[in-house]
């Protein structure tokens, strides 16, 4: 598919939502409906020295811009590709004497592009940045205060020789960033590393049970010949069959919240009241709050356990932030034990604890206990998420890897195969995560064949292999959730 080609969609007025996009042809699961390059994008302030400012990949060794000493790149190819967007920024940073925050940098990049190309539609865009929603009129007192600070800082940073924009227009751009900023992740999809504006994506409306997902692809510059390079882009991918004329939707937030909580988040962050079927009917809310059936606990017991779980999660967050991982495990075990006679395995409080416990225990290399919690977590997720949900796929992948580390080769292989099937739909076969998962799938398949042929020899060979190479340690647990689709200023 040509990036920027939009023949598969058209803009229409969606009832109760304003503008939206609908399909002009039929699509099936895993189809890429459109791909779009960022209009403008920047790396987060905290990662400017660790992430390429062109492709947003994490690298150990990056080349620094020799002039401003701020921008970092994988290599000369990425640096050359970045120059058009970095040229004005480079001069402005040198003159300003310091690096402004990511919001200021992104606003400036957008306006330098407007200065170069005008305010009309650019190639492949169905909407200009001028016509994107800003919701400035809905900002609360604190947001208005932050906006004034951002505008003042921007005016100090913006070069006097560049085109001068009105205060109203500058405020509009900051509003656009606030409402339409899309989170950019690293090449493994595990960490949010930046934020970008994708105008066409801004036309896709929300649904808590969507028919599409959005995936960030960092592109590939590794080939010797530039003709084989692929560009950094987002891809809108179908999660199942989509009929011609059907509205295209994505979920702006994680589904695993009560409908009332999702609606509250959406109202606060995106200024609209969600009227999707799952919110109107409270679908799956009963599972999110499910209690044991036999014997069924009283409402008072359930209420007390909810409060106890909330208090424990607060203690866990504090312990995690301080790196006290053994304390985290202790708190999880105690709370899960108390929840056992009260909550069912789809209860959100159970699932949150299972997720934390499996992640932290994997990091501590206590794989046997971690694998038990991971299996319970996946069983619960499978009853709640859409079968092709990207977050489900990532969770199943991690659970499969944990079970493989624990020596549960059959369970681990089964989970990795399941995760691979999901990620083929949500990420596509060429995404780095999917490629990693394919390598894992092939390895576990080979080991499973050996296991079935001679279980004793398999365990002897596995033990020898693990003794002769460093154990792969899971990433250190983070308090940060998995990267959300849309970026909100903290």
Curated annotation (Swiss-Prot):
Fetch the PROSITE patterns from UniProt.
SET, ZF_MYND_1, ZF_MYND_2
User: GO CC terms for this protein?
Assistant: cytoplasm; nucleoplasm; nucleus
Query: Where is it located?
Result: Cytoplasm; Nucleus
What is this protein's tissue specificity according to the annotation?
Expressed in cardiac and skeletal muscle, lymphocytes and thymus.
- Enzyme class at the top of the EC tree: transferase
**Reaction(s) catalysed by this chain's protein:** L-lysyl(4)-[histone H3] + 3 S-adenosyl-L-methionine = N(6),N(6),N(6)-trimethyl-L-lysyl(4)-[histone H3] + 3 S-adenosyl-L-homocysteine + 3 H(+)
Q: Which residues form the signal peptide?
A: none
SMART domains hit by this protein? SET
Query: What results from changing residue 160 to L?
Result: In strain: C57BL/6
Q: Does the keyword S-adenosyl-L-methionine apply?
A: yes
Quaternary assembly: Interacts with HDAC1, HDAC2 and HDAC3. Interacts (via MYND-type zinc finger) with NACA isoform skNAC.
Q: What is known of its domains?
A: The SET domain is split between the S-sequence (residues 1-49) and the core SET domain (residues 181-258), however the two segments still come together to form a conserved SET domain fold.
Q: Under what name is this protein listed? A: Histone-lysine N-methyltransferase Smyd1
Q: Which organism is it from?
A: Mus musculus (Mouse)
């Amino acid at each position: 598919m040509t990036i920027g080609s939009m023949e598969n969609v058209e803009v229409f007025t969606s009832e109760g939502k304003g503008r939206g996009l609908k399909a002009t042809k039929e699509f099936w699961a895993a189809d890429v409906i459109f791909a779009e390059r960022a209009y403008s994008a920047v790396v987060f302030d905290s990662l400017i020295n660790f992430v390429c400012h062109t492709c947003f990949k994490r690298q150990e060794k990056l080349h620094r811009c020799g002039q401003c000493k701020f921008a970092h790149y994988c290599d000369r190819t990425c640096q050359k590709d970045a120059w058009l967007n970095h040229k004005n920024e480079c001069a402005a940073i040198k003159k300003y004497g310091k690096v402004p925050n990511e919001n200021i940098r992104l606003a400036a990049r957008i306006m330098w592009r407007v200065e170069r190309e005008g305010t009309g539609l650019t190639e492949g865009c169905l909407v200009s940045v001028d016509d994107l929603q800003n919701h400035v009129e809905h900002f609360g007192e604190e947001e208005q205060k932050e906006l004034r600070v951002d505008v003042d800082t921007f005016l100090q940073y913006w070069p006097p020789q560049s085109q001068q924009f009105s205060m109203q227009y500058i405020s509009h751009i900051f509003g656009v960033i606030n409402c339409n900023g899309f989170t950019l992740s690293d090449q493994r999809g595990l960490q949010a590393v930046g934020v970008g504006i994708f105008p066409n994506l801004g036309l896709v409306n929300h649904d808590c049970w969507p028919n599409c997902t959005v995936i960030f692809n960092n592109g590939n510059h590794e080939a010797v010949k530039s003709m084989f390079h692929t560009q950094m882009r987002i891809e809108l991918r179908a999660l199942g069959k989509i009929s011609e004329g059907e509205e295209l939707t994505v979920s702006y937030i994680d589904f695993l919240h009560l409908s009332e909580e999702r609606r509250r988040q959406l109202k606060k962050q995106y200024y609209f009241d969600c009227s999707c079927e799952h919110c109107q009917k409270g679908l799956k809310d009963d599972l999110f709050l499910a209690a044991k059936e036999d014997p069924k606990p009283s409402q008072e017991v359930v209420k007390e356990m909810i409060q106890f779980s909330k208090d424990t999660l607060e203690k866990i967050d504090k312990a995690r932030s301080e790196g006290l991982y053994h304390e985290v495990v202790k708190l999880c075990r105690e709370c899960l034990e108390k929840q056992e006679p009260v909550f069912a395995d789809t209860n959100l409080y159970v699932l949150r604890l299972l997720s934390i416990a499996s992640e932290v225990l994997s990091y501590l290399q206590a794989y046997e206990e971690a694998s038990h919690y991971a299996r319970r977590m996946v069983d619960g997720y499978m009853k709640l998420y859409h079968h092709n949900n990207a977050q489900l796929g990532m969770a199943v992948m991690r659970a499969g890897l944990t079970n493989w580390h624990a020596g549960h080769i059959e369970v681990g292989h089964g989970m990795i195969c399941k995760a691979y099937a999901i990620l083929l739909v949500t990420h596509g076969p060429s995404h780095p995560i999917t490629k990693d998962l394919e390598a894992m799938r092939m390895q576990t398949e080979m080991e499973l064949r050996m296991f079935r042929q001679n279980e004793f020899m398999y365990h002897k060979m596995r033990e020898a292999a693990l003794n002769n190479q460093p154990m792969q340690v899971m990433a250190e647990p983070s308090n940060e959730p998995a990267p959300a689709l849309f970026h909100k200023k903290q």
